[in-house]
């Protein structure tokens, strides 16, 4: 984590003493840097999940960037509209149906809506699609809107995909 001119490294390890030793060796190459080490046990991973792990919007931003980088590696023209599919999951059929109404109001086509036969808590899958461009800022806006709808109905947004457009 980098903030206010400081770089903080967090290591999760089964051998804290060895990790501290390795840090000392690595940082010895930078004698002008001030550094400290702290060892703290976090069996429940509270610090990781409550501080280091990204919130849902940051996580989706990371995932969006990953998909877009893949598109760019394949010479995609991000500004061209194409069908973008999204997957969302809900705990109840009622909430899935409420979400579907909202998606339709936003111009999405409902590709499928079904109950999954697995043991997951979110058994109702909704797959939607709409013509959109894949420009990073635009994708973030539409994904965040879908995240908000899903979360307001006790569901979650699982991601998006599209064909490469040249």
Describe each model-derived feature in a short phrase.
Residues 1-166:
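Long, contiguous binding/interaction regions
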């Amino acid at each position: 984590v980098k903030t206010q001119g400081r770089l903080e490294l967090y290591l999760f390890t089964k051998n804290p003493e060895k990790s501290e030793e390795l840090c000392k060796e690595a940082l010895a190459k930078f004698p002008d840097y001030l550094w400290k080490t702290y060892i703290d046990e976090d069996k429940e991973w509270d610090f990781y999940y409550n501080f280091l792990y990204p919130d849902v919007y940051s996580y989706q931003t990371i995932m969006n960037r990953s998909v877009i980088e893949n598109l760019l590696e394949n010479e995609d023209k991000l500004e061209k509209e194409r069908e973008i599919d999204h997957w969302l999951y809900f705990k109840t059929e009622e909430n899935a149906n409420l979400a579907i109404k909202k998606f339709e109001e936003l111009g999405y086509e409902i590709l499928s809506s079904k109950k999954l036969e697995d043991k997951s808590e979110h058994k109702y899958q909704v797959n939607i699609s709409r013509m959109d461009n894949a420009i990073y800022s635009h994708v973030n806006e539409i994904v965040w809107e879908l995240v908000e709808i899903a979360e307001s109905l006790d569901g979650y947004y699982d991601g998006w995909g599209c064909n490469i457009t040249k």
